[in-house]
Design a protein with these regions (language model features):
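Short active-site neighborhood of thiol/selenol oxidoreductases, capturing the structured segment around
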Residues: 1-22
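Hydrophobic beta-strand anchors of alpha/beta hydrolase catalytic cores
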Residues: 3-4, 36, 100
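N-terminal post-signal-peptidase region of extra-cytosolic proteins
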Residues: 6, 87-88
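Solvent-exposed coil/turn segments that connect beta secondary-structure elements
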Residues: 8-9, 39-44, 60, 70-72, ...
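Alpha-helical elements of the RecA-like P-loop NTPase motor core of helicases
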Residues: 13, 49, 75-76, 119-123
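Structural microenvironment flanking redox-active thiols in thiol-disulfide oxidoreductases
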Residues: 17-77
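Structural micro-motif
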Residues: 62-64, 75, 81-87, 93-101
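Thiol-/selenol-based redox modules, centered on thioredoxin-like
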Residues: 88-132
Length: 132
């Protein structure tokens, strides 16, 4: 399974907690058990070139993916996944729900959580892995 979440580097509120919970879940589940993919909500500042520094700062587990790209492409993906957000054009910050999705091997979104503790993520991944 893949744990998919949506964050941005300059977020000082929910993103650090979200990243911490996703990271804790992945480490508890163990290497090779789950894929982590974090999609930026701020592709204007979180450019592909900035992502390695961000991954190091967040101490993401080995194999985690931070994803960005052209703003129009990232926004299209976020819209397709129904990720609600609002960008403040004055300071660039993004108001958003702390969303985590668990995606199965077929690419189906099996769970969609708002601000889940690590334990919910762990249980969701275990259920997806077991097929229940």
């Amino acid at each position: 399974p893949t744990v998919l979440s949506f964050v941005f580097a300059n977020c000082q509120t929910v993103c650090p907690v979200l990243v911490r919970n996703v990271t804790r879940a992945a480490r508890t589940l163990g290497p090779g058990t789950v894929n982590i993919a974090l999609v930026t909500l701020d592709p204007w500042r979180d450019t592909p070139a900035a992502l390695p520094e961000l991954a190091a700062r967040w101490t993401l587990p080995e194999g985690s993916r931070l994803l960005s790209g052209e703003p129009e492409n990232v926004c299209r993906l976020l819209d397709t996944l129904q990720v609600a957000r609002e960008r403040d054009l004055k300071n660039g910050d993004v108001s958003h729900v702390p969303l985590v999705m668990i995606v199965d091997a077929r690419g189906r979104i099996v769970y969609r959580f708002s601000n889940p503790p690590a334990e919910w993520i762990i249980e969701g991944v275990r259920r997806v892995r077991s097929g229940s």
